[in-house]
């Protein structure tokens, strides 16, 4: 869905490789230990996946005027993916979802051990903010980098993604006592928060890296308005994405999903299928998909209007909006 995913993959691995090289000069870790750590830390990244969040960051940024292959943009997108991957490694642990399969491969704790998987997740989360701290070296304005740190840390922190997981655990094994409002709150926190941040980081990077930034985004209130629209888009995508996930978990097998199917039902988790039935959940996913595309159109109107006024709306920008529309549509009507 994104023709330049290979560039992102390179940044994901190269960042950890650079950290390994830096650590090699400190004489506290042997070459064998460094290689072992590097293998462990890159394992969940190399498993692949949809790369939904970093692709959203890149596509939103391009729609806001950023060059497609700008190093600072790729660094920001990689930071988003590190945070997401860390959350998956921790979610799969026996004390959480206790899953053996992720992205079609054995989960990290099955390969390296439970305690080691905990450390792998910790390492990826820490590395994400190390990347953002260095983003200015790649051409991102320091104020934009700082705001990216603020948004990502809040979305992934105690009152964002972590709160969602906490709330999810509280209702696991007690799903009958919960309702639709509770489910939406879990999905908004656990999934929507980081997707919202991914879109917001795209706006911040895109507006900062655009060659027409001074003309298009000179009014700070304008950027804030675009930022809010992007966050609303990400939150709506998150809820739709998770409901689609609930339907797929109930209707597909493990090979089709690349992860263990039927786990939600086995663990008595609160899901859209449990509350609405398979058909009802599918209808709700369709409604939210349409709502997400409306949110995207709102974001486009806010941004493209400013770009047109500054004569910076061109064929590249138009293509980026089209790619973003296609990406979101394919994401929310997926079958695996």
List the model feature ranges, each with a label.
Residues 1-336:
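All-alpha prenyltransferase/terpene-synthase fold signal
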């Amino acid at each position: 869905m994104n023709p330049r995913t290979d560039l992102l993959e390179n940044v994901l691995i190269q960042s950890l490789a650079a950290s390994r090289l830096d650590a090699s000069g400190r004489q506290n870790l042997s070459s064998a230990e460094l290689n072992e750590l590097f293998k462990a830390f890159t394992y969940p990244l190399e498993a692949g996946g949809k790369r939904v969040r970093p692709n959203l960051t890149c596509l939103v940024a391009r729609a806001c005027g950023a060059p497609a292959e700008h190093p600072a943009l790729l660094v920001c997108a990689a930071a988003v993916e590190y945070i997401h991957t860390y959350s998956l490694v921790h979610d799969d642990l026996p004390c959480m979802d206790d899953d053996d399969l992720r992205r079609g491969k054995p989960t990290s704790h099955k390969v390296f051990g439970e305690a080691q998987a905990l450390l792998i997740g910790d390492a990826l989360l820490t590395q994400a903010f190390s990347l953002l701290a260095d983003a200015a070296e790649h051409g991102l304005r320091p104020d934009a980098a700082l705001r990216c740190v603020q948004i990502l840390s809040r979305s992934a922190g105690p009152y964002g993604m972590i709160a969602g997981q906490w709330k999810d655990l509280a209702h696991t094994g007690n799903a009958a006592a919960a309702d639709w409002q509770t489910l939406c709150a879990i999905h908004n926190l656990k999934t929507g928060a980081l997707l919202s941040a991914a879109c917001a980081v795209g706006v911040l990077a895109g507006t900062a890296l655009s060659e027409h930034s001074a003309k298009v985004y000179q009014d700070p209130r304008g950027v804030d308005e675009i930022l809010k629209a992007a966050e609303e888009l990400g939150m709506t995508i998150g809820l739709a994405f998770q409901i689609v996930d609930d339907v797929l978990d109930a209707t597909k097998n493990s090979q089709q999903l690349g992860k263990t199917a039927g786990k939600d039902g086995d663990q008595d988790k609160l899901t859209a299928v449990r509350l609405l039935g398979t058909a009802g959940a599918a209808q709700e996913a369709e409604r939210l998909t349409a709502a997400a595309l409306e949110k995207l159109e709102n974001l486009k109107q806010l941004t493209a209007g400013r770009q047109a006024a500054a004569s910076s709306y061109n064929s590249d920008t138009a293509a980026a909006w089209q790619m973003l529309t296609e990406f979101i549509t394919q994401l929310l009507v997926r079958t695996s």
